[in-house]
Each structure stands twice: as C-alpha cells, then as structure tokens.
Amino acid sequence: MAKDNSFDIVSEMNLEEVKNAIQIAEKEILNRYDFKGSKSEMSLDNGDLVLISDDDYKLEQLKDVLITKLIKRGVPTKNLDYQKVENALGGTVRQRVKLKSGIDKDDAKKINNAIKESKLKVKSQIQDDQIRVTGKSRDDLQAVMQLVRELELSVDAQFTNFR
C-alpha cells in the first residue's frame, strides 16, 4: 500500500528578518542626504511596523527604502497591510503597517475550491490559518503547489511540513 504524501500551505512572516530589514533601512536613512535633519524613524511595535516621518513625501520614501530591504531579506511584501496615515506629535505623520500571518478564511476557501476544481487526486483540509494537502502522488502535490502559486491571493503562500 502506498504511503500518503502531504504538505501544508501557510503564510508566515519571519520576524527576525523583518527586524534585520528595519535595522538596515534605518542605517540607510541615517546616511541619505534627503533625510538629513528629518525625524524619520521606523520601529516594530506589538507585531506592527510603525513608520514616522516629517511629511507624506518622506513617508513614501521611507516605505520605499523599507520595501527594498524587505525584498532583499526574502520577506514577502504581500503580507504588509498599510493602515491610514495619521498626524503625530511634533508635526510629523505616522503610518502603521500590520504584518499579516496566516491564511484568512476567504483565501483558504479560494485555495480549497481551486484544488477541488483542478480534479487532481488530492484532499485538502482547512486547519485554522493553514491548509493541509494530502495525496498519493508527489506529482499531484507539485501540481497543487504550482496551482496555488498562480492564484491571486491577498497573502504570500509558502509550503512547509513536507511528508
């Protein structure tokens, strides 16, 4: 009897890599000419990124620097949820960026339906914020991986726990 193979579809953010990207971005901001004398800063607060700058233009520049550093560190930028820009103390502007982890119910249903419609001989189960896919053939599982990569999801999907 053939053994079933399986893997999990998850969406995670490596907080250590996010912290490293923030530190590298802060160093770049300290050395950039257009940020000299500015009150621009970024920090990690309760699992959220907080971006503070003098005005909207510098805030956008701050986001651009951060995004390039996150991409270089291999952190998925699809999992960043930008909140509304708000005024802060001292005439500065602040923007919170939520770090999304886990697959929400809508995306999980979308993945599940796509797998069922593909007619591959695999089973998929939604387990909280991840999806377990099992099947006898590794080729079918790889086809499911390719299918999930092609879907338009609100978060970045990763594949873990191969068995």
UniProtKB/Swiss-Prot annotation:
In this entry, which stretches build a coiled coil?
A: none
Q: Name one Pfam family in it.
A: DUF520
Swiss-Prot/TrEMBL keywords: Nucleotide-binding
Which InterPro entries did the record assign?
DUF520 (IPR007551), UPF0234-like_C (IPR035571), UPF0234_N (IPR035570), YajQ-like_sf (IPR036183)
A cellular component term, taken from the record's GO annotations: cytosol
**GO MF:** nucleotide binding
CDD domains under this entry?
YajQ_like
Similarity remark: Belongs to the YajQ family.
| Task of the protein | Nucleotide-binding protein.
**Sorted alphabetically, which NCBIfam families does this protein's record hold?**
PRK05412.1
Protein's recorded name: Nucleotide-binding protein EAT1b_2037
Species annotation: Exiguobacterium sp. (strain ATCC BAA-1283 / AT1b)
Which taxonomic lineage does the organism of this UniProt entry have? Bacteria, Bacillati, Bacillota, Bacilli, Bacillales
